[in-house]
Regions:
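Interdomain/boundary linker segments immediately adjacent to catalytic/signaling cores
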Residues: 1-30, 34
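Non-catalytic C-terminal interaction segments of nucleic acid-processing enzymes
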Residues: 3-7, 122-152
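A short acidic/basic microdomain associated with nuclease active sites
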Residues: 34-54
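Short, solvent-exposed loop/turn segments that connect beta-strands within catalytic domains
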Residues: 54-55, 66-70, 128-134
């Protein structure tokens, strides 16, 4: 099983903060990174902060698709369990989308990337302390960028 071999054998990255939510989010990002790597993706960066003056301006993960032609900005959302009353993408609200749009534009300009790019959301359902492997939903090409959007 990919999860047991990839996540449990390596020491998970922990943020400086001792908050439980930060640890859970970091664990979810570790799980998502292992999932993408096992699908043939290349992780370019994690917890990338392209906007120097805004500490909220963070991209959870930047990856290259298996064909290496597309840069994918990934937002990871970690939940203890699925909720029957909540939409899976409610965690990415208008304010978060605006921050992500600014962060992605900053990264694209900094790297001078003129190729294809998109925005994905990965949701991880599970607990760090649970013996059961987490469930993962990968939503590709979530509409974050306006149609035909270019910044140059």
């Amino acid at each position: 099983m990919w999860f047991a071999t990839a996540v449990f054998k390596k020491k998970p990255s922990m943020p400086d903060s001792g908050h439980e939510n930060a640890r859970t989010g970091s664990w979810g990002e570790d799980v998502a990174a292992c999932f993408l790597q096992n699908c043939g993706w290349k992780i370019v960066g994690r917890r990338v902060r392209p906007c120097m003056r805004d500490r909220r301006c963070e991209i959870d993960m930047i990856a290259r698709s298996p064909d290496r032609q597309t840069v994918v900005f990934v937002e990871v959302k970690t939940h203890a369990a699925r909720s029957p009353r909540a939409s899976p993408l409610w965690g990415v609200d208008r304010r978060k989308k605006n921050v992500l749009l600014r962060a992605c534009a900053s990264w694209l300009m900094w790297e001078k990337w003129h190729g294809n790019f998109r925005f994905d959301v990965i949701e991880v359902f599970g607990r760090r302390t649970s013996p059961r492997p987490p469930e993962i939903d990968h939503f590709e090409n979530v509409p974050l960028f306006p149609p035909k959007w270019r910044f140059w």
